[in-house]
Amino acid sequence: MSINLTLDIYIYFLNNARSFCGKQRSKQLNFLCSKQYWRMNHVNVHREFHTSKKSCKWNRSEAHCSKHWHSSSNHGVHIGIVKLSTSAPKGLTKVSIHMSRIKSTLNSVSKAIFGSQNEMVSRLAQFKPSSRIFRKVSDRGWLKHKNVKQAIESLKNYSDKSAEKNSFAEQKSYFADKEEGSDKHSLYHYAYRITTRFGESFYFLANHINSYFKNKEKMSQIKEDRQLQDKPCLEESKSISPSPDILTDRPDSGPPLNVEDKLSSSTQLPEALPVSTKQSIANFLSRPTEGVQALVGGYIGGLVPKLKSDPKSQPEEEEEPSKTDEPICKDKKAEEKKRVLLQREKIIARVSIDNRTRALVQALRRTTDPKLCITRVEELTFHLLEFPEGKGVAVKEKIIPYLLRLRQIKDETLQAAVREILALIGYVDPVKGRGIRILAIDGGGTRGVVALQTLRKLVELTQKPIHQLFDYICGVSTGAILAFMLGLFHMPLDECEELYRKLGSDVFTQNVIVGTVKMSWSHAFYDSHTWEKILKDKVGSALMIETARDPLCPKVAAVSTIVNRGQTPKAFVFRNYGHFPGTNSHYLGGCQYKMWQAIRASSAAPGYFAEYALGNDLHQDGGLLLNNPSALALHECKCIWPDTPLECIVSLGTGRYESDVRNTTTYTSLKTKLSNVISSATDTEEVHIMLDGLLPADTYFRFNPVICENIPLDESRNEKLDQLQLEGMKYLERNDEKMKKLAKILSREKTTLQKISDWIKLKSDMYEGLPFFSKL
């Protein structure tokens, strides 16, 4: 939108100045005036006078004043006549800048208030001043007053009257036809500082906005106050600098100021002037010396509180929750910082672990002395026990081929150390038979003598010890004790049965009163410390992984139940082996624990022994979750020998009691309910039914005799134990064909093809990465 404003006549009141100058484009304009004239100040009230005839002449180089008017105080009045246009080439440069500011101001106001330029054009109808207006104004006799003050007062009175009497339609009709002789007056729309003749539409716009956004009474009061302040401003305005368009000099002052000084003084002037924060829009539209920033900051800024709800209170409201959120934010930041620090520490620790692993592997590979090799191997073993995550780095460093070559050296100590570290890394030798052979023993306390009878019969048929018959032995509670005695310590069955009976008599002998007190105190009827002492003496404090030093030792595991990880119990496996890097078992476990700790944790039956705390975990009897560990043993074997088929799995029970009595009661007691829950949790037949249906024929063998009496777990009387043995022998006699079939399977040797395949695999593992002929 382009607006052309043509100002025909400007009358300047100048005081005590000799000359002033300006610039029009590149040419300098000099205005020659009398010695006495009024000085221009944009703070004071400046009025616009219209005359009927032109009294000043304009040319490119000079402007000469041809008419002087003197007031009662004998001050000279210099009347300067300048025809200016925002698009005309003859306008002063500074005034043109101000006209462009007015234009940009109108654009901003139109966008902020009316919303479109079309509405702006329809509402703001501009009228170009003409000679008719000049004659109308001159007829009023505004310039006939004897002094300036009276002229200003008459201007105020006239403007107030014209604002009340005239309307937009009357003003429009007056400009349309002057010769009709109507008494309609032309609008003189004044502002408080500098007058700009934009017509009745601006007055209507200002009045409408002020009435909508402000209190009318408050605006009228502010208008009267400012009008009263205008009078002393005219009398006392002698030391204030002129407007940016005019430079003045006092008679007793120095040389005239140049244009640069004028600009610097004009820029410093607004800082010292008090400007109201809320002014009418007509004031901003009529002030060419103020820019768009003043409009937005002063007037539009005053409208924002009307459009929004108290913006000053919003920061306060935001600060209050922010203050309350400060502790939460600090806690979150502290937690985040701790998490980052822990993560960084883990990364640093992981890097240091990997570097340490590489250093140990490289040191071992550089060693040639067998004794020094043993030391290096043990150092690497201890390192991997403490940091199992380093096994992957060791495998990448080709530690397995080097260890397999070391195992060929005729040194028993070195071979034992190499077997231990190979088992820790997860490397395993081929199975003993044609496939994987698994032995799983249920829990049941002293009723484990029933399982001993089955094993005795199996040894008689195969003529081999148990640890040579099976590749993997797993047990729960009393089954873990049997697995350790048979698989790790290679005890004969007679010695094992004698030790088993002695353990029962030593542990399960307790006074009823003392046991009841202990039960209420530690939830354990028997003394757990006595049981731990017996285990340390009989089993020892060797680590589980150290049993892998024996070349005839099978893979052995004991199962316990962790009760403090989550809401549901979880099975935990104490192993004498490790899984190969990249192989993940579904069950928790480790091989860095002592053997007596494994048995203690696996046999911590609730009510009999106290739960066992190992590290951060709380262990109880494994029978609470998996009283039949056959499925767990099968899963572990698939992790150890993933490419080897299953030859057989033998599951040994400790006897089950089935009552034929049927109760006719319609309800059960709380004790009965709890007993049913425990029985269902420790049930072993469901796993048997599942495996029997899933596994191939002649692969799964379950031996669990039915006993005629419900014998408790802590039965230590010899007659009761003899009764259990007798019932077990009768059961084996009834299943003699089944036992013979199992013995035949366990007695089979590997085929020649399997032996060749195992030899090729061993050679390929020993010389991995080396030329083909070196493998032969």
Swiss-Prot record:
Sites of N6-succinyllysine modification: K730
Location in the cell: Endoplasmic reticulum membrane; Microsome membrane; Mitochondrion membrane; Peroxisome membrane
Sequence motif: GXSXG, positions: 475-479
Keywords, sorted A to Z: Endoplasmic reticulum, Hydrolase, Lipid degradation, Lipid metabolism, Membrane, Microsome, Mitochondrion, Peroxisome, Transmembrane, Transmembrane helix
Pfam families from the UniProt entry: Patatin
EC class name: hydrolase
Catalytic activity, reaction form: a 1,2-diacyl-sn-glycero-3-phosphocholine + H2O = a 1-acyl-sn-glycero-3-phosphocholine + a fatty acid + H(+); a 1,2-diacyl-sn-glycero-3-phosphocholine + H2O = a 2-acyl-sn-glycero-3-phosphocholine + a fatty acid + H(+); a 1,2-diacyl-sn-glycero-3-phosphoethanolamine + H2O = a 1-acyl-sn-glycero-3-phosphoethanolamine + a fatty acid + H(+); a 1-O-(1Z-alkenyl)-2-acyl-sn-glycero-3-phosphocholine + H2O = a 1-O-(1Z-alkenyl)-sn-glycero-3-phosphocholine + a fatty acid + H(+)
Location of the motif GXGXXG: 443-448
Record EC number: 3.1.1.-, 3.1.1.5
GO biological process: arachidonate metabolic process; arachidonate secretion; cardiolipin metabolic process; fatty acid metabolic process; intracellular signal transduction; linoleic acid metabolic process; lipid homeostasis; phosphatidylcholine catabolic process
Positions of transmembrane segments: 469-489
Short sequence motif DGA/G: positions: 621-623
Biased composition, class Basic and acidic residues, residue ranges: 226-238, 307-331
Molecular function as annotated in GO: calcium-independent phospholipase A2 activity; lysophospholipase activity; phospholipase A1 activity
Domain of life: Eukaryota
Residue span, PNPLA domain: 439-634
Name listed for the protein in its UniProt record: Calcium-independent phospholipase A2-gamma
Originating species: Rattus norvegicus (Rat)
Lineage of the species this protein comes from: Eukaryota, Metazoa, Chordata, Craniata, Vertebrata
